[in-house]
Regions:
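Eukaryotic intrinsically disordered, low-complexity regulatory linkers and tails enriched in Ser/Thr/Pro
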Residues: 1-102, 106-170
Length: 170
């Protein structure tokens, strides 16, 4: 059974988690609640992308233009959901996903004491195994992508408003 995924603007983070059923996904929400879904993080991300008729691979390739990396690129699903990957666990077996995704479209804060973590809009802390410098770099890239998406959306709205005004004089 496919669980219903929350709205993009409600998702603060998407984390891989080992459960008795195997790899699962914990979704942290902006209000502090959590949802556990019975699928891998990759499947959850694919489902989030597909409801916007988007491809994970194409979004990651597009983000590589900003990051100049081949892997661990942000997934910009929508202006409300720009997911930045961060390493949160060691794999139990080779091939296990080790990356969580944090939504930089919502307020996130890097916490370095006692260990590196990202604090979400809902106040949850996501422990990160990377260095402070690497985390800051990934968050900055995601914020840059988010700002560009917002700017493109604003330009689109202004163009539509201008066309509407032009038609009113006909």
């Amino acid at each position: 059974m496919r669980e219903e995924l929350p709205e993009d603007s409600e998702i603060a983070a998407v984390l891989p988690e080992y459960t008795e059923r195997g790899d699962s996904t914990r979704i942290l929400l902006r209000d502090g609640r959590e949802i556990l879904i019975d699928c891998t993080t990759k499947t959850a991300l694919r489902r989030l992308a597909e409801r916007h008729c988007k491809s994970l691979g194409l979004m990651r390739a597009w983000a590589a233009n900003y990051t100049h990396r081949r892997s661990a690129n942000p997934v910009a699903i929508d202006c409300d959901l720009v997911l930045v990957p961060v390493k949160t666990r060691e794999p139990r077996v080779p091939g296990d996903n080790t990356l969580a995704q944090v939504n930089v479209a919502l307020a996130v804060r890097l916490v370095t004491e006692p260990h590196c973590a990202i604090e979400t809009a809902g106040g949850q802390r996501v422990p990160v195994l990377w260095s402070r410098k690497m985390i800051q770099s990934h968050i900055a890239e995601g914020c840059h992508i988010h700002a560009d998406l917002l700017q493109a959306q604003q330009r689109s709205v202004l163009r539509r408003l201008a066309r509407k005004d032009d038609r009113s004089f006909l």
